[in-house]
């Protein structure tokens, strides 16, 4: 089983417009609502890839029942921690004239110490059956930056961590198996500009030296890099039609987790994660993956060991 755990789910609105004009009235071609946020996206993606997964998250307000109901319809096993404050609502605007995506992201509401304790209790209960864990998403205001670190300290199996800044730095002490900040998040964590490929790889290997077995940096349609202490890999992504980029990073994490769960070596797991991200890019709703579609993208991805 895979565990997807995180504190920042969202109830997501996806709007399609012919041409977005700021400061004007914009009428939408279509409007969709979906369960989302990193932890939810990972759970949905893993389920679509046919692997058992428990999705652990807090939720409150009107969105709690909506998210729970949709996950049940999708066949996603979940454990929801009741939260006093309402779950955030985020909006994605897809401009079909330019292909650009505009994100209106509400920050997650603070979560109480009692709710965090309940979350950890459920995590530890389900951990007994887990072979891979994905810890993902920003921490709500007031949550200790050590929260992910403390969960990793209790975890006996490989952990994929999608976090940044203080929570990533703290978690490195417990040696997560794989971390996947984006380029900007890595710069923020290291507090330095990574202006070229050489600087980027050196920055990634600093994170390896500080505890992460693998570091993965995706850059959208550009090269993805992966490093361990001994090796550097360059991956050239597949070409895919852009419909909605939301949850591509989460699909990458889910694809890697599923491949590791199936015993694949890390470079191949990353390749399969990239195929999942490419498939997600072509879908309107987040993380609704198909292994059949993914195979086409998998075959296009180029992998080169640099060191």
Language model region names:
Residues 3, 54, 134, 160-162, ...:
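Structural detector of well-ordered beta-strand residues that form the stable sheet scaffold
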Residues 1-23, 32:
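Positively charged, low-complexity intrinsically disordered leader regions
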Residues 47, 152, 261:
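Gly/Ala-rich phosphate-binding loop of Rossmann-like dinucleotide-binding domains
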Residues 129-140:
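Short acidic, glycine-rich surface-loop motifs adjacent to enzyme active sites
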Residues 27-87, 300:
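Substrate-binding N-lobe of the ribokinase-like
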Residues 146-230:
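Conserved phosphate/ATP/ADP-binding segment of small-molecule kinases
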Residues 169, 197-307:
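Conserved phosphate-binding/catalytic region of the ribokinase-like
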Residues 93-129:
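Conserved phosphate-binding/catalytic loop of the ribokinase/pfkB sugar-kinase fold
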């Amino acid at each position: 089983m895979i565990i997807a755990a995180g504190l920042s789910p969202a109830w997501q609105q996806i709007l399609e417009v012919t041409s977005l004009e700021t400061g004007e009235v914009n009428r939408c071609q279509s409007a969709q609502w979906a369960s989302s946020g990193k932890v939810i996206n990972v759970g949905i993606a893993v389920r679509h890839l046919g692997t058992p997964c428990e999705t652990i998250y807090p939720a409150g307000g009107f969105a709690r029942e909506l998210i729970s109901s949709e996950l049940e319809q999708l066949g996603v096993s979940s454990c929801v921690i009741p939260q006093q404050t309402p779950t955030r609502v985020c909006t994605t605007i897809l401009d079909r004239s330019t292909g650009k995506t505009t994100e209106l992201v509400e920050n997650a509401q603070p979560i109480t110490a009692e709710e965090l304790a309940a979350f950890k209790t459920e995590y530890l209960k389900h951990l007994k059956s887990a072979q891979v864990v994905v810890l993902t998403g920003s921490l709500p205001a007031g949550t200790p930056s050590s929260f992910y670190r403390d969960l990793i300290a209790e975890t006996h199996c490989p952990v994929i961590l999608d976090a940044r800044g203080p929570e990533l730095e703290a978690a490195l002490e417990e040696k997560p198996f794989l971390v996947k900040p984006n380029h900007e998040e890595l710069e923020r964590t290291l507090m330095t500009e990574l202006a070229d490929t050489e600087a980027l790889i050196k920055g990634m290997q600093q994170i390896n030296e500080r505890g992460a077995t693998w570091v993965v940096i995706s850059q959208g349609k550009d090269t993805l890099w992966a490093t361990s202490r001994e090796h550097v890999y360059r991956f050239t992504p597949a070409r895919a039609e852009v419909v909605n980029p939301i949850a591509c990073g989460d699909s990458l994490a889910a694809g890697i987790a599923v491949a590791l769960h199936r015993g694949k070596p890390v470079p191949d797991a990353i390749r399969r994660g990239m195929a999942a991200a490419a498939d997600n890019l072509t879908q309107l709703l987040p993380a609704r993956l198909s292994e059949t579609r993914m195979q086409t993208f998998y075959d296009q991805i180029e992998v080169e060991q640099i060191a």
